[in-house]
């Protein structure tokens, strides 16, 4: 028998040799076939060869063995493999020299590193070559004894165990279901129930007994490796002839290559740290063939079984079918490249009059406006298709306007001669400044013009005279802060040439243009477009309005791609795979056929590791897409860029493209120094931009974003950003959007698991399919949301750049729309202020702009900036569960309607200037002392303009009015349109108009907008609040509705009925005369119908909503707003229980049935939790490690950090932990046994620690119940009668007494009538008083001195016969209670009340926690580090005041009389009330405290103090 030892460093050599061997012709001899005697002679010759000169027999020697014989590493089980002395073949007579300098009586280092069984005995001489020569040969009998001993050692394990050395780890990995994300991996790995220590110990004893019973029952007769098979039984096979040896050798190597190499390579790819040692015994022909075939069959069966198991368990993309895609490529990319390369030789397709029809898509300026490029498409008749074309515009000129400085007279009061002299003085001063300070500006032209102004600088609104200056754009612009003696400031110095070009040529979005006198570019092209032209004058560009406007818009080419990334050893993200879909027929005005796509996938090896052995073969069998494999990342990215250039897409589409994908691609391009990287865009560049902002130029829309600089000429479509603008969802990741919008399932993917998917071809193909389907879902989402046609319509309305509409730059859209309108009316336009790096972030415009809808300020430094003015009104909700229909009435575009209703515009609202001439902010004289400069400004309240004012110059209302009329016209067309395609186009257009109109208000309050007018924005929101309050008053007092909630522009009313049609009729009543008589432009209508509603707090509710109400196809769906049920710091069990409780509450069942179902379900959950009936994965909590472990100041209160610290101590790299989610569970025992009261972090464990502890670590079930299960349930049942926290706690099996306090707080002053039937109609009967009593800190309790009955003091009350009774009588024994005792109780009650208030205790919002403290922590965090919620003031000013008012109500006899008169009860005078004097004296005590309180007082002198100061001035 011969052993071939394959160590880690030799596996690649073996694999490469096997490939080399397969390529050699069989006629050539690779091996020398010799017998044992000849081989022994060769070994002796090697040992005798003294190949180191003059070393005196020391140091270097050759043992005569082969390279694969070194067995310095232990095998599995800690045993060393014995060296065989018999060999069959040799690669080549290479010498393996081992350096060692030996001192006398010392052994060699080789002997030191060898196993003990192979080290020479102390008596043996090892350093003399002469003695090595005299080594005696081993006899045949001794060889037999040695081989028998070897077999006995090898057969100590069964054959299956020997095979496990090679493939057990692989089979274990393959049998696992494919997990694309960490949650799936945790679920599949830890879906096991935990065992107690006793169960583990009992199981261990049982296994030992069974193991002992199986000793001696091995199937040795059928085992070819049985230890009973002696050396004699196989000795005859060793004397086989040369042909037999050759046949055995070939079969052995073939099996080795096919089986062992596959297993070992997969192991190394799965885990590079696995130490693989393969062992193959050379046997006779039949035995060897049987063994290897059996091993191979076993592996194949195991793998096939695992594949079947995997595909059954893992439906990763159910519902997605790519069958409609063309199986054949649309075009061969190489042929396509050759054809398109010839387009440069084609002439320009000029019209008969010599003009060129050019459809423009994008534009870009370089070098501070010197170079202006327009990108678009032209029709190439030779190719019968549209090709890309670039146009460079020369001859642009800057336009500046200088405002003359007034001296002595007001503007408009000068004579014509004085105006001429004033303008001449400005001209001379500016020309002098040009010559001295700006010699680069060689010449310019000037002339006086009349322009209007209506913005925020201290310039009187109206028409004034300006000096207009024009000069070539190749000269530098003047600074915006320049001022002189004769002029105040200069407008237009920061305006980009692209913006000026769009405004001057009146270009509103992508359209056909007629180009006059175009010149084709043949040499030194600056772009990657197929064609290029140059024009010398911007006036040669005209928007086509008539003939060509009827021409259909050219189709666009899109390239949709998706990445898979991996983490490199240097802790950097690398791209491992790119899948792309190509579509050459994207429609601009309607839906596109996304099924006709060509796909290709590029992938590379991971860190040089081999691919699966059969991957190339299976790639050839796949015909539906193109898969290309590369050796490294650079080759793959270069191929990707090359294909982008060949395809030349107009649209580059991806999900979350702007959120990191493109940044990663550019980072890898820069790091790997990829060639021709600028082909990603259409403008040739040599240096990769490395700054987020381009401060060097006045680029369009301010500074530029890096991906924009790289991809100019192509449009970036990020479905993540577009979805945020077009749909309102709780999440915008691809998985959620695919499920909600496309009704298709997708599995999340974690990059950490990517190496495990490179093990086999099946797994790798599943990863390829996942990546390709991500791209397919992305383009489907783009088509489903109509992103292309919708953003095109938005761009055509606003007149901005298309790429900015795709980036959700709503503020910029509004800017451009207003710029077009004000430019048309000859207004001086406000300058664009340069943004700062800290303000320029991805989606900056969208984020800040969105916040202005609710009156919130933009984010600053990661925190919300305090609102400079009040936002929308939120009516206090009447929290509770409503099981009848709730109507949601909503104003149609409230803020735009207010602008039209009151004619609000820059030109009509009188306000103070907010900017100086140098652009700095004017310090507000209304700002309170000590107020921060950036926060808390008191905005001047402007007055509504007179409605009778001329509205011709009111630009903003006219723009909105025009948009509303256009939308109405489109809706009218939709009613009569029967063509589905045209109907879809009209729907997209009316939606675009609506989005534009609704966002116009935002530019007024957006601080970075050029049209920022805070006073107008504050006036609009104030009017909106007044409108909502007036609507609520009409609904309640005139229409008799019960308004339960209101927010900004909508109210919820309780219809009190369960009939849908009846509730809809009620919803039409507010649309009647009541509101129409008040407003002309404001309209209110039904926006939603809720079958049932669980209203908890502001902006937090859950409901069953009628979808498509008013139609026969109406259905009920569940809608949840603001209820955070998917936080990662809740374990899956908590989420499941919370969802079940919510579904039961909204189910519509009877209250008794709901309580019964909850009791049964929660009791079952509690029982399973205590009896280990729930799998471990349901208890796992995950939380992200956002920074390095050392940066966390306190680890005790952060369990995930403590677990990460232990993982790091166990050898896991910190780079693999940071920014990843750490899973953990909470155990019942502390991690450090020396701690008696450990923090939560001391009880946190990684799930693997729990599984490997064998029952030593148990979960803290009580903690999970109190901190994970109870809190979400408590918030849901807080306002539901019949269900309280005590009930839930009892169901879950915990002590309900702990939650008695929270349950009592929930009750709203219910009175116990079991013993006293006298309390029938207490005085606190109105809804206000009942809510007041429920908001009190405590109620006045007294104890009867006669019968010792304790009860809440009722004050003045009536019996059932309307007889007024005094509260000074005991409700049980009816004995009088002394007045002095009542007064003493009132005094003590007031003292305790004020003491509680001034203590200022803070209490945690979490009922299960309830921690109370007087400490003030950052951000009001709970003092309990294990808790996640915040503290609230326990006894607030409002509660204290409500309690005092409650006491007043107990003793206020006059109010009692008034209430009785309202209710039609018996009229009594004050004197007729029993114990009137006593009640008056006790009320006086309360009144004294109320008078000293300033909570319910308004200091008018401080409010109107500014008027007093104004008079003094």
Curated annotation (Swiss-Prot):
Protein name: DNA polymerase alpha catalytic subunit
Residue window of motif CysB motif: 1404-1427
Main location: nucleus
Cellular component terms (Gene Ontology): alpha DNA polymerase:primase complex
GO BP of this protein: lagging strand elongation; leading strand elongation; mitotic DNA replication initiation
Family, similarity comment: Belongs to the DNA polymerase type-B family.
Documented EC number(s): 2.7.7.7
InterPro entries according to UniProt: DNA-dir_DNA_pol_B, DNA-dir_DNA_pol_B_CS, DNA-dir_DNA_pol_B_exonuc, DNA-dir_DNA_pol_B_multi_dom, DNA/RNA_pol_sf, DNA_pol_a_cat_su_N, DNA_pol_B_thumb, DNA_pol_palm_dom_sf
Region ranges (Disordered): 235-254
Keywords: DNA replication, DNA-binding, DNA-directed DNA polymerase, Metal-binding, Nucleotidyltransferase, Nucleus, Transferase, Zinc, Zinc-finger
Additional remark text: In eukaryotes there are five DNA polymerases: alpha, beta, gamma, delta, and epsilon which are responsible for different reactions of DNA synthesis.
Record-listed Zn(2+) 2 binding positions: 1404, 1409, 1422, 1427
Keyword rRNA-binding: no
Record organism: Oxytricha trifallax (Sterkiella histriomuscorum)
Subcellular location: Nucleus
Top-rank taxon: Eukaryota
GO terms for MF: chromatin binding; DNA replication origin binding; DNA-directed DNA polymerase activity; nucleotide binding; single-stranded DNA binding; zinc ion binding
């Amino acid at each position: 028998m011969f052993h071939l030892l394959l160590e880690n460093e030799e596996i690649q050599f073996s694999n490469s040799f096997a490939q080399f061997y397969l390529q050699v012709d069989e006629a050539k001899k690779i091996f020398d076939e010799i017998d044992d005697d000849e081989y022994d002679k060769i070994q002796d010759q090697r040992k005798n060869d003294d190949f180191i000169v003059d070393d005196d027999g020391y140091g270097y020697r050759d043992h005569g063995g082969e390279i694969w014989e070194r067995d310095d590493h232990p095998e599995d089980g800690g045993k060393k493999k014995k060296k065989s002395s018999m060999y069959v073949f040799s690669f080549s007579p290479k010498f393996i020299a081992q350096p060692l300098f030996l001192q006398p009586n010392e052994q060699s280092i080789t002997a030191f590193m060898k196993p003990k069984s192979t080290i020479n005995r102390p008596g043996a001489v090892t350093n003399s070559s002469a003695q090595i020569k005299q080594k005696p040969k081993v006899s045949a009998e001794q060889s037999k004894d040695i081989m028998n001993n070897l077999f006995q050692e090898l057969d100590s394990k069964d054959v299956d165990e020997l095979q496990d050395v090679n493939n057990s780890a692989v089979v274990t990995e393959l049998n696992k279901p494919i997990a694309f994300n960490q949650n799936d991996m945790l679920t599949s790995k830890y879906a096991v129930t935990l065992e107690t220590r006793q169960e583990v110990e009992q199981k261990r004893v049982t296994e030992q007994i069974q193991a002992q019973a199986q000793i001696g029952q091995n199937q040795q007769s059928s085992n070819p490796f049985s230890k009973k098979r002696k050396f004699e039984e196989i000795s005859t096979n060793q004397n086989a002839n040369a042909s037999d040896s050759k046949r055995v050798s070939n079969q052995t190597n073939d099996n080795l290559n096919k089986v062992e190499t596959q297993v070992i390579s997969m192991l190394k790819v799965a885990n590079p740290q696995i130490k693989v040692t393969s062992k193959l015994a050379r046997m006779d022909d039949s035995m060897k063939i049987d063994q290897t075939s059996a091993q191979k069959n076993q592996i194949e069966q195991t793998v096939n079984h695992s594949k079947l198991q995997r595909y059954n368990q893992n439906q990763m993309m159910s519902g997605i079918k790519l069958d409609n895609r063309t199986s054949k490529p649309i075009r061969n990319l190489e042929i396509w490249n050759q054809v398109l390369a010839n387009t440069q030789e084609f002439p320009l397709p000029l019209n008969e009059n010599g003009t060129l029809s050019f459809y423009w898509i994008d534009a870009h300026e370089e070098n501070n406006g010197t170079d202006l490029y327009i990108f678009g498409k032209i029709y190439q008749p030779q190719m019968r298709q549209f090709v890309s074309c670039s146009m460079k515009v020369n001859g642009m000129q800057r336009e500046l306007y200088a405002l003359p400085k007034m001296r002595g007279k007001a503007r408009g009061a000068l004579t014509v001669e004085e105006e001429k002299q004033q303008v001449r003085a400005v001209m001379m001063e500016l020309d002098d400044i040009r010559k001295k300070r700006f010699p680069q500006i060689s010449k310019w032209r000037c002339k006086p013009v009349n322009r209007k102004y209506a913005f925020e600088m201290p310039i009187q609104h109206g028409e004034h005279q300006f000096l207009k200056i024009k000069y070539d754009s190749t000269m530098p612009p003047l600074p915006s802060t320049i001022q002189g003696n004769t002029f105040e400031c200069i407008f237009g110095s920061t305006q980009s040439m692209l913006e000026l070009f769009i405004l001057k040529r009146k270009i509103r979005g992508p359209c056909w243009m007629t180009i006059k006198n175009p010149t084709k570019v043949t040499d030194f092209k600056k772009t990657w477009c197929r064609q290029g032209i140059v024009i010398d004058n911007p006036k040669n560009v005209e928007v086509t309005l008539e003939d060509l406007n009827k021409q259909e818009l050219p189709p666009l080419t899109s390239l949709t791609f998706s990445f898979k990334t991996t983490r490199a050893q240097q802790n950097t993200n690398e791209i491992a795979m790119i899948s792309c879909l190509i579509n050459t027929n994207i429609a601009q005005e309607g839906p596109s056929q996304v099924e006709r796509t060509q796909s290709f996938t590029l992938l590379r090896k991971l860190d040089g590791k081999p691919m699966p052995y059969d991957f190339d073969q299976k790639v050839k069998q796949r015909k539906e897409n193109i898969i290309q494999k590369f050796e490294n990342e650079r080759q793959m990215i270069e191929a990707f860029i090359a294909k982008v250039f060949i395809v030349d897409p107009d649209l580059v589409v991806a999900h979350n493209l702007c959120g990191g994908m493109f940044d990663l691609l550019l980072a890898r391009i820069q790091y790997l120094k990829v060639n021709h990287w600028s082909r990603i865009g259409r403008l040739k560049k040599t240096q990769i931009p490395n700054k987020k902002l381009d401060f060097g130029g006045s680029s369009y829309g301010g500074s530029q974003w890096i991906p924009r600089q790289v991809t100019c000429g192509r449009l970036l479509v990020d479905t993540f950003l577009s979805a945020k603008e077009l749909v309102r969802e709780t999440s915008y990741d691809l998985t959620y959007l695919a499920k909600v919008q496309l009704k298709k399932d997708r599995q999340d993917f974690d990059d950490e698991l990517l190496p495990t998917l490179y093990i086999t071809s099946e797994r790798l193909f599943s990863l390829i399919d996942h990546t390709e389907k991500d791209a397919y879902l992305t383009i489907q989402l783009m088509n489903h949301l109509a992103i292309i046609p919708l953003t095109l319509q938005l761009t055509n309305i606003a007149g901005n750049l298309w790429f900015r509409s795709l980036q959700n730059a709503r503020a910029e859209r509004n800017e451009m729309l207003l710029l077009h309108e004000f430019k048309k009316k000859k207004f001086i336009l406000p300058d664009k202020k340069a943004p700062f790096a800290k303000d320029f972030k991805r989606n900056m415009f969208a984020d800040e702009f969105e916040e202005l809808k609710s009156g919130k300020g933009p984010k600053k430094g990661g925190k919300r900036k305090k609102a400079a003015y009040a936002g929308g009104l939120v009516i206090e909700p009447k929290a509770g569960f409503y099981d009848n229909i709730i109507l949601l009435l909503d104003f149609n575009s409230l803020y735009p309607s207010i602008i039209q209703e009151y004619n609000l515009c820059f030109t009509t609202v009188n306000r103070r200037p907010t900017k100086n001439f140098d652009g700095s902010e004017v310090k507000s004289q209304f700002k309170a002392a000590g107020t921060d400069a950036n926060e808390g400004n008191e905005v001047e309240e402007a007055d509504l303009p007179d409605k009778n004012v001329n509205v011709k110059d009111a630009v903003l209302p006219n723009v909105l009015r025009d948009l509303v009329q256009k939308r109405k016209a489109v809706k009218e067309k939709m009613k009569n349109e029967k063509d589905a395609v045209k109907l879809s186009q009209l729907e997209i257009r009316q939606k675009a108009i609506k989005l534009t109109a609704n966002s116009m208000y935002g530019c007024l309050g957006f601080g970075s907008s050029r049209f920022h007018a805070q006073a107008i924005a504050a006036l609009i929101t104030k009017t909106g609040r007044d409108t909502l309050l007036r609507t609520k008053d009409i609904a309640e007092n005139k229409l008799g509705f019960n308004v339960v909630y209101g927010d900004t522009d909508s109210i919820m009313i309780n219809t009190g009925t369960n009939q849908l049609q009846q509730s809809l009729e009620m919803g039409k009543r507010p649309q009647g005369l009541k509101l129409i008589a008040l407003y002309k432009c404001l309209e209110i209508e039904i926006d939603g119908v809720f079958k049932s509603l669980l209203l908890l707090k502001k902006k937090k509710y859950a409901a069953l909503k009628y979808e498509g109400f008013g139609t026969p196809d109406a259905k009920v769906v569940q809608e949840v707003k603001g209820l955070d049920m998917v936080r990662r710091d809740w374990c899956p069990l908590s989420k499941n229980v919370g969802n079940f409780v919510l579904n039961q509450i909204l189910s519509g069942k009877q209250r008794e049935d709901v309580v019964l179902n909850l009791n049964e379900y929660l009791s079952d959950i509690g029982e399973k939790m205590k009896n280990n009936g729930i799998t471990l994965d349901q208890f796992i909590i995950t939380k992200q490690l956002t920074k390095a472990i050392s940066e966390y100041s306190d680890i005790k209160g952060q369990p995930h950090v403590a677990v990460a610290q232990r993982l790091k101590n166990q050898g896991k790299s910190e780079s693999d932990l940071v920014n990843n989610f750490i899973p953990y569970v909470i155990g019942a025992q502390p991690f450090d046994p020396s701690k008696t009261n450990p923090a939560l972090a001391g009880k946190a464990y990684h799930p693997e620690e729990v599984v490997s502890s064998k029952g030593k670590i148990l979960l803290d079930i009580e903690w999970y119940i109190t901190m994970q299960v109870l809190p979400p349930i408590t918030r849901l049942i807080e306002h539901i009668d019949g269900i309280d926290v005590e009930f839930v706690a009892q169901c879950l099996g915990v002590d309900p007494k702990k939650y008695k306090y929270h349950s009592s707080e929930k009750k709203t002053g219910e009175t116990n009538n079991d013993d006293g039937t006298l309390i029938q109609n207490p005085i606190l009967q109105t809804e206000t008083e009942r809510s007041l009593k429920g908001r009190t800190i405590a109620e006045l309790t007294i104890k009867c001195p006669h019968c010792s009955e304790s009860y809440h003091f009722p004050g003045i009350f009536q019996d059932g016969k309307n007889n007024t009774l005094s509260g000074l009588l005991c409700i049980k024994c009816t004995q009088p209670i002394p007045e002095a005792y009542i007064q003493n109780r009132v005094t003590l009650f007031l003292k305790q009340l004020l003491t509680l208030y001034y203590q200022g205790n803070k209490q945690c919002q979490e009922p299960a926690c309830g921690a109370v403290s007087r400490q003030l922590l950052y951000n009001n965090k709970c003092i309990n580090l294990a808790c996640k919620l915040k503290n609230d003031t326990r006894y607030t000013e409002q509660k204290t005041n409500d309690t005092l008012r409650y006491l007043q109500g107990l003793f206020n006899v006059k109010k009692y009389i008034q209430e009785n008169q309202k209710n039609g009860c018996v009229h009594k005078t004050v004197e007729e009330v029993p114990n009137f004097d006593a009640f008056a004296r006790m009320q006086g005590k309360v009144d004294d405290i109320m008078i000293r309180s300033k909570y319910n007082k308004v200091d008018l002198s401080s409010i109107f103090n500014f008027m007093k100061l104004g008079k003094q001035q």
